[in-house]
UniProtKB/Swiss-Prot annotation:
Pfam family, one: YgbB
UniProt cross-references to Gene3D superfamilies, sorted A to Z: 2-C-methyl-D-erythritol 2,4-cyclodiphosphate synthase
Enzyme class: lyase
Keywords: Isoprene biosynthesis, Lyase, Metal-binding
Matching SUPFAM superfamilies: IpsF-like
Protein name: 2-C-methyl-D-erythritol 2,4-cyclodiphosphate synthase
NCBIfam families: ispF (TIGR00151)
UniProt cofactor(s): a divalent metal cation
Note on how the cofactor is bound: Binds 1 divalent metal cation per subunit.
Site annotation Transition state stabilizer: residues: H36, T135
Pathway: Isoprenoid biosynthesis; isopentenyl diphosphate biosynthesis via DXP pathway; isopentenyl diphosphate from 1-deoxy-D-xylulose 5-phosphate: step 4/6
GO MF annotations in UniProt: 2-C-methyl-D-erythritol 2,4-cyclodiphosphate synthase activity; metal ion binding
Length: 159
């Protein structure tokens, strides 16, 4: 069986008046995240993990922030495109594990909704999707409530 592991990491700074989107879910908070696209840091980390697993670079290569075509882009669309590239190479998801690193907002009320969005976008069982959150105990930029970081690890298997 041919399997691949991909790791993704992304960070965005709080700011602006756009809604806070995390994992395709609108999370109530006083501000959104600054980004060229819609700023969904969760989906960006996952997209990088998918692309990394199949040796296709990163989202910056596929959707450069210098290209106005991607200004305000829907990150769910970007993720589905990345996953299609993996499927075109014969791979499907085995499982996904995501860690959201944020002091604010509290993520627990939103974890299940994020898992459900990801399950639909990957067309896989909910049991294959794990999302968790942690803080840095008020240390660093996330602890100072300046932004959010996300790590994602995905296992892809040859279909």
């Amino acid at each position: 069986m041919n399997i691949r592991i991909g790791h993704g990491f992304d960070v965005h700074k709080f700011g602006g008046d756009s809604p806070l989107l995390l994992g395709g879910v609108n999370v109530p908070y006083e501000t959104g995240l600054i980004a060229h696209s819609d700023g969904d840091v969760v989906l960006h980390a996952i997209s990088d993990a998918v692309l990394g697993a199949v040796a296709l670079g990163d989202i910056g290569k596929h959707f450069p922030d210098t290209d106005d075509d991607f200004k305000g882009a829907d990150s769910r669309h970007l993720l589905r495109h990345c996953y299609q590239l993996a499927k075109d190479k014969g791979f499907v998801i085995g499982n996904l594990d995501v860690t959201i690193i944020a002091q604010v907002p509290k993520m627990a009320p939103h974890i299940q909704a994020i898992r459900e969005v990801l399950s639909r976008d990957f067309a896989t069982d909910l049991d294959n999707i794990n999302v968790k959150a942690t803080t840095t105990e008020k240390l660093g930029f996330t602890g100072r409530k300046e932004g959010i970081a996300v790590e994602a690890v995905i296992l892809l298997a040859k279909a």
